[in-house]
Each structure stands twice: as structure tokens, then as C-alpha cells.
Amino acid sequence: MNKIAIQKPNIPENLQTADFHDAVTQDDVISMHLFEDCTICGEDIERLCVEKTVFRNVVFIDVSFRHIELTDVIFEKCDLSNADFSGAVIHRTSVKQSKMVGMNVAEATLRNVSFEECHGHFSSFSYSNMKQVRFDHCALMQSECSDTVLQQTHFDGCELEGASFTGTSLQNMDISTCRFEQLHVSLDKLKGCKIAPEHAIAFARALGAVIV
């Protein structure tokens, strides 16, 4: 599999440790901050801007950041489960070893974004537009990627059981290293999609074939 070159977040060495609630109260743009070993709870902010910032060991509880703009941001060992990032614009951002169960990233724009060893069961990326995005060794069972634009987007070693790519073109994509027995796809958008031999049964089922 050819590796897609992803631009890494540009993070300064000296970040200011801060309380998230205080930071959003004082500034229109959160910039050059480190949020570590804390909980962000009950925040409902639309069109928040975050840049050159690291979230490490942060738990997000009942948060809504619709249309958030993230540029040069790292999430490391965070819990983003059920967070609402719908409509987000995300550039040069890395999400590492984080929980994203039920996270809503629908209708978002992602450019140069990497997800590494994340648990994203039931997450939604539907109606999003992705370019130069990587999912490496992520658990994405029952996730939603319907009607999504995937340009130079790779899934490497991911668990995709029950995931939905309905309405999404998988043309010339390589998902041969991923694991699934059932995948929801649009048959007219599969030309050139590279799969492993064991995936053929799943695609035969999608065609309506009965395996005996």
C-alpha cells in the first residue's frame, strides 16, 4: 500500500498550560495551549477556533463544538466519545490512541488529518469531504461514511465490520489490510477497489449472492 504523505501539525515547543473554560472565556481563538489530564464538560460553543494546541489525556463529556475550526492540533489519548464536531473544518490535525465512540464529524472538511489506533465505533463522517486523510489501525465498526468524498484517503489495518460507505466512491481505494465480514457499499462505486480474497464473500453478499 502506498503511503499518503500527510502534513503533520505544526506545534510550537513551548505551550501554555491552561484551563479550557478560562481559555474560551478570555480568547476568541485558542492558540498555543496545552490541555492535559483534565475533563471538558458541558461546553456548547459554535464556530470555536483552535490552533497550535495539544489535548493530552483529556475527557470530553457532553460537548458540542459544531463548525469548530482546528488547525495544527493534536489529540493524544483523549476520550471524544459522543462529541459533536459536525460541520468542522480540520487541517493538519492528528488524533492518536483516542476514543471516538459515537463521535459526530458529519458534514466536515478534513485536510491532512491522521487517526492512529483510535476506537471509533458508531462514529459518523457522513457527508464529509476528506483529502489526504489516514486511518491507521482504527476500530471503526458500525461507523458511518455515507455520501462522503474520499480523496487520497487510506484505511490501513482498520476494523470496518458493519461500516457504511453507501453513496461513497471507493474507486481505486485499497482496503485489503482492513478486516470486515459485512460492509455497506454502493455497487456502482467500487470499480478498482482493492480487497483481500477473504473480502470477496462480503462483496458477493452485497451483490445479493447466497453463499452455500
Swiss-Prot record:
The keyword Magnesium does not apply. Residues 63-102, 103-142, 143-182 form the Pentapeptide repeat domain. Keywords: Repeat. InterPro entries: 5peptide_repeat, PA_immunity-related. This is Uncharacterized protein YisX. The lineage of its organism: Bacteria, Bacillati, Bacillota, Bacilli, Bacillales. The gene is yisX.
